[in-house]
């Protein structure tokens, strides 16, 4: 069994950034991800250009059962800190609208930046790795994987939500949370596609992928 200080499951934006910060603090970190390609959702975000932050981000923009957490987290690391990191790597970006910042070139720039930060912090990333099960014994987490057994003092689950199953999204993180007695708020779909009848597809199908400024309302709510 391989021992380490921190195990992070999930190599998306949150997992990679968390691993970097732990590594900077002198912790030995291993990141596991089942995907072949890391940062899949990042690469798709913002139409492939990654809307990586918003200049007007505030704790007031978040809904939470613990509002103080958002306030505390955002006071310790602000959007300006992340923008400084992006600038440090020479990633060109622009404001699209309402403070939204997008890469000029491609979302891959952000993925490469996060991976470079992990490398600087000596984070060990193991992709194409399936998690078989997780146990807790003698004050350590034991993670059994397709690459063998690993144990750590700290465990971070950063597997994301249920959106985009084609990118590998699963209820894994929710199951682990329940296993360790962490309460789960019932999930609801937030972003959903239009589902069209076949005759409608024939008429407007060619419009797929075109973006326009629009407003929508339902029952006097928009």
Specify the residue positions occupied by each region the protein language model found.
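Hydrophobic/aromatic ligand-binding patch that stacks against planar heteroaromatic rings
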Residues: 17, 21, 34, 42, ...
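N-terminal Rossmann-like FAD-binding beta1-loop-alpha1 element of flavoenzymes
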Residues: 4-31
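Residue-level detector of alpha-helix initiation sites
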Residues: 8, 12-13, 37, 161-163
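Redox-cofactor binding/interface segments in oxidoreductases and associated redox assembly factors
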Residues: 9, 44, 157-158
